[in-house]
Each structure stands twice: as structure tokens, then as C-alpha cells.
């Protein structure tokens, strides 16, 4: 397992290290270079027993073991791109049939064979989903959609009233030909439900027919699935209970957007499957996900002490850093390890795209606090329809900027790795996603956290529900029109906190809800609130 240690000052030693550590997949045309991370041979060797256990755990996960004990669930996103891995014949058949259905439906919509109830082809897609149900589709569209290819996409991925107004307002005049896709695993998540109700109101007011334009992606027999069945929606697709939102991009959640813009979704799945195969190799030096996970571990001392800065040098991948934020941070950001010890694990992720970032925060990366490692992503193949003007090729400049930033960071002792793709298409996107999925899974095993649950998210949902319940009771107290301070409101309720009630009243009075505020906003304890 010998290779030279990192050397910023000796180019020949560093070249040898580059050659020794470079990983390449010929069919995918994909390279991984971790030579500028500070991982050394003795550290990789010391990690090997833990990595062997991680390989075993990943093998058991793929074979159908309960990998999420909190919810007694299997974790099967790897089965989606290789149904033969699924633990039963019924499941293998179901997964394969689902891909066939998605492909056929997408083709029918794109080619105008599946029409809106008005009898004309669909013109737009309104996609309603939160978290992975929004980020995965957004990545698919931004990364793979070409001009005039498939249908335009519009996203409701939040409950911001202004954002919803802008998106829905932009569909004015086309609601009758808009395909509306609602994604909710349980069918009970508030954000997609609220977005769906707002979209339905606008669509029906414009003369559209909801059932003939609505598609659901949800678990079988969920609240949303039952509604879609009862109302005879246009189409329903499965969101399996063994697929988490952050790893759902190779399910209907990611495949349907791809199909609706005319992508080859089977190539996307094939790329993910190829990378899955490459990352099953039980030799860290020949396994790109293991090299990444080991590099992350050593860089952050096994405690997540360095952030991951994602720098893709392609506009198509500008959403990728946000996609990785959820994949990495929701998977690894845990208070407890599997043994119940308080560990506060995690890796913070941020980024945008090159070379834009060189004119933004790269200044700090080069000269500021050394608390990160960078991940460069590049594509070699340039678009042929951008001409050479005055002997200037945009792609040459982009490559020069990437190499220059990489060199500047390395000279400053800042760790970085680079993923290079010969070209970028559905297959490479699938491979890229699968590479990070496996690296996250292996790293989770190295630090002994459950990478497949999200108790913090659930805690946030419960806290939000409590606030909404408190708001309802605050409004009931104020029905009598008597002005009260927040403390007096709390005393009537015998519940809540003054600060929470103040936040609620500030929100209510900031909108046309017939609530009044008297007093000085800079002295909240003395403010009095009432209803007309």
C-alpha cells in the first residue's frame, strides 16, 4: 500500500503520488485524483480494518439487511439501478416494471401522445416536492435538459408565499396544459400538500381538470396514493418505503423528470450501476468511494473538522453542491453514534460553480482559515457550437482557471481532490451520484453513525407542528378583541414562551389578518396585541 506522502514543494514526488493514487474507469471515462489530499499510506493502512467492516456492512445492506434500525427498514436504493440485487422476485419485477412505466409515460407526454384533458399536448410540468423530492429533480433538469428538449419545468419546493406566487403566476394562460406532479413519500408532509392545494386552486380556476393533469409519486396506500386512486388521477408511481428522499434520484423521483425532458433514463441507471460495481471492490486503493471516504476521514480527523467545498467547473452541475448538501449533511450529521455516544458528527458542504467561485469565496479558501477541503469536478469535452474568436476558446480558459485555482490552493497547503469526466451525459451523472452515495455510506460506517435516518429533521417537524398549534390557540385567545401583551397571552394559555408568542404576533400583524400592534417594536415586552 506504499505511495509517497503529500509534498507541496517537490513536483517529482507529487507526480509519483498522483500516478500511484489516480483511479480511472475506462468505460465511464472518469478519473478520481485524491493525491492533493493529505492521506498517507500508513493512515490508509491503519483504516483498512475499519474499511473492511464498512465493505461488509455495505454488502449486507445491498443484500437486504435492516440498515435503518430506527425504522426497521431496509435501504435499497442500490436495487433501483440493478433490480437483480433486490431480495425477492416480486420486488425485482416491480422495480423493472416501474422503469418501463416511467419511460413509456415520459415518451407519451413528450411526443404529445398523452394529452391534457383539453385535447392538446402538455406544455409545462409543475413539480411539487421538498428536500430530495425537489433537489434530485432539480439536478436532473439543470444537468441534463438541453434547449427545446422535452417540457419546461417549474418547481414548488417551499411554502414561501412570494415564491409560490411567482411560480404559479408564471403559468398563467397555460394551466390547462400543465402536468402537475406531486411527490410525497408518506403523503402527509405539509409542504408538498400545501403546494398541491395552491396549484389545484389555480388550475381549476383557469378551467383545468385536476384529475386529468395530476400525477402522484408516493408510497403505496399512503394518504396521497389513496387520494389519487379515489379521484382517478392521470398516473401514480411508487416511492418505495426502503428509499430515502436523499437517495431517491434513481427512483421515479429522478427518473420521471428525466423522461419528461427526453433523457435516456436507462443510461442514467446504467451509469449508477457501473459505479456501484466499481465501488464494491474490497481494496481501498482500487475503490474510488473508499479513497474519497478515507480522504474525508483523515482530513477531518474522523470528526468532520473540515468542510467540503464543491467546485464543479460546468454550469450544468451548479445544483450539484446543493444536492450534496442534503446527501452528505443529512446522512452524516448525527448527534449520536450507533452505540448511543454523543459524537456530533457531520461534514458541512457548500459550493456553487467555477469559475464564478474564483471571483467570490476562493479568496478565503486560499488565504483564510484552513478548515475545508475542495472537490473539483471537470468535464473535458467542450460544446462544439461555441466558436473560436480571436484565438480564444472559452473551454481553454475554464480549464486554465480550474488548474490555476487547484494549484493556488495546493501551494497554500489547502487540501483538494478532483473528479474528471471525459464527457458529461446521463451515464456520467448516474455514476457521479452513485460515487458520492457510496462514499457517504462508507464514511458513515467509519465513524459509526446511521447514515440512513434523520432524527433531527423529525424533531424540526414536531417543533413546527407545536408552533402552528400554539398559533391557533393564540388566535383563539385574541378573538375577544382585548389588547394583551405576549406575557398576558401566555398566562391565559398557560403554555408557550413569550418569545414564541411574540414571533407569532409579529407574523400575524405583518400580514392583512386583522391583527393590531400597539407600542414600540424595539421593546417587545411592552407591546399589546389585539384583533379587530
Curated annotation (Swiss-Prot):
The active site is at residues 330, 359, 461. Its main location: cytoplasm. InterPro entries: G6P_Isomerase, Phosphoglucose_isomerase_CS, SIS_dom_sf, SIS_PGI_1, SIS_PGI_2. Pathway: Carbohydrate biosynthesis; gluconeogenesis; Carbohydrate degradation; glycolysis; D-glyceraldehyde 3-phosphate and glycerone phosphate from D-glucose: step 2/4. It is found in: Cytoplasm. GO terms for biological process: gluconeogenesis; glucose 6-phosphate metabolic process; glycolytic process. It catalyses: alpha-D-glucose 6-phosphate = beta-D-fructose 6-phosphate. GO terms for molecular function: carbohydrate derivative binding; glucose-6-phosphate isomerase activity; monosaccharide binding. Its EC number is 5.3.1.9. Coiled coil: none annotated. The keyword ATP-binding does not apply. The keyword Cytoplasm applies. It holds the Pfam family PGI. GO terms for cellular component: cytosol. Keywords: Cytoplasm, Gluconeogenesis, Glycolysis, Isomerase. Catalyzes the reversible isomerization of glucose-6-phosphate to fructose-6-phosphate. Belongs to the GPI family. This is Glucose-6-phosphate isomerase. It comes from Synechococcus sp. (strain CC9902).
Amino acid at each position: 500500500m506504499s505511495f509517497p506522502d503529500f509534498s507541496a514543494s517537490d513536483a517529482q514526488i507529487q507526480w509519483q503520488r498522483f500516478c500511484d493514487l489516480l483511479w480511472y474507469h475506462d468505460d465511464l471515462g472518469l478519473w478520481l485524483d485524491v493525491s492533493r489530499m493529505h492521506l498517507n499510506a500508513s493512515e490508509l493502512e491503519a483504516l483498512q480494518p475499519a474499511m473492511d467492516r464498512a465493505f461488509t456492512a455495505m454488502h449486507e445492506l445491498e443484500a437486504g439487511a435492516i440498515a435503518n434500525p430506527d425504522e426497521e427498514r431496509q435501504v435499497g436504493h442500490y436495487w433501483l439501478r440493478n433490480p437483480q440485487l433486490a431480495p425477492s422476485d416480486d420486488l425485482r419485477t416491480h422495480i423493472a416494471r416501474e422503469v418501463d412505466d416511467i419511460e413509456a409515460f415520459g415518451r407519451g407526454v413528450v411526443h404529445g401522445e398523452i394529452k391534457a384533458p383539453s385535447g392538446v399536448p402538455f406544455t409545462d410540468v409543475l413539480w411539487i416536492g421538498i428536500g430530495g423530492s425537489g433537489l434530485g429533480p432539480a439536478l436532473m433538469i439543470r444537468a441534463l435538459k438541453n434547449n427545446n428538449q422535452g417540457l419546461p419545468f417549474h418547481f414548488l419546493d417551499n411554502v414561501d408565499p412570494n415564491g409560490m406566487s411567482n411560480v404559479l403566476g408564471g403559468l398563467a394562460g397555460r394551466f390547462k396544459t400543465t402536468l402537475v406532479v406531486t411527490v410525497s413519500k408518506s403523503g402527509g408532509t405539509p409542504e408538498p400538500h400545501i403546494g398541491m392545494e395552491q396549484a389545484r386552486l389555480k388550475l381549476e380556476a383557469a378551467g383545468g381538470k385536476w384529475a386529468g393533469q395530476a400525477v402522484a409519486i408516493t408510497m403505496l396506500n399512503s394518504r396521497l396514493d389513496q387520494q389519487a386512486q379515489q379521484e382517478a388521477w392521470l398516473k401514480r408511481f411508487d416511492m418505495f418505503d426502503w428509499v430515502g428522499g436523499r437517495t431517491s434520484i434513481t427512483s421515479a423521483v429522478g427518473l420521471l423528470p428525466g423522461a419528461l425532458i427526453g433523457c435516456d433514463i436507462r443510461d442514467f441507471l446504467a451509469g449508477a450501476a457501473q459505479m456501484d460495481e466499481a465501488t464494491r471492490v474490497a481494496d481501498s486503493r482500487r475503490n474510488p468511494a473508499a479513497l474519497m471516504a478515507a480522504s474525508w476521514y483523515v482530513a477531518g480527523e474522523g470528526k468532520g473538522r473540515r468542510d467540503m467545498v464543491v467546485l464543479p467547473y460546468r454550469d450544468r452541475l451548479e445544483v450539484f453542491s446543493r444536492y450534496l448538501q442534503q446527501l452528505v449533511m443529512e446522512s452524516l450529521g448525527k448527534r449520536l453514534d450507533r452505540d448511543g455516544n454523543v459524537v456530533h458528527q457531520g461534514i458541512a458542504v457548500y459550493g456553487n460553480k467555477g469559475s464564478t467561485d474564483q471571483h467570490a469565496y476562493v479568496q478565503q479558501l486560499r488565504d483564510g482559515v484552513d478548515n475545508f477541503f475542495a472537490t473539483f469536478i471537470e468535464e473535458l469535452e467542450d460544446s462544439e457550437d461555441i466558436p473560436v474568436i480571436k484565438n480564444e476558446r472559452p473551454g481553454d480558459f475554464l480549464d486554465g482557471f480550474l488548474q490555476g485555482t487547484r494549484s493556488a490552493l495546493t501551494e497554500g497547503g489547502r487540501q483538494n481532490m478532483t473528479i474528471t469526466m471525459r464527457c458529461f451525459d446521463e451515464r456520467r451523472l448516474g455514476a457521479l451520484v452513485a460515487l458520492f452515495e457510496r462514499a457517504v455510506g462508507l464514511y458513515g460506517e467509519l465513524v459509526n453513525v446511521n447514515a440512513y435516518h434523520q432524527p433531527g429533521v423529525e424533531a424540526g417537524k414536531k417543533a413546527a407542528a407545536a408552533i402552528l398549534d400554539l398559533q391557533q390557540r393564540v388566535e383563539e385567545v385574541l378573538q375577544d378583541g382585548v389588547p394583551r401583551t405576549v406575557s398576558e397571552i401566555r398566562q391565559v394559555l398557560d403554555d408557550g414562551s413569550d418569545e414564541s408568542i411574540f414571533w407569532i404576533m409579529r407574523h400575524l400583524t405583518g400580514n392583512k389578518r386583522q391583527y393590531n400592534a400597539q407600542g414600540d417594536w424595539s421593546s417587545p415586552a411592552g407591546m399589546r396585541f389585539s384583533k379587530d
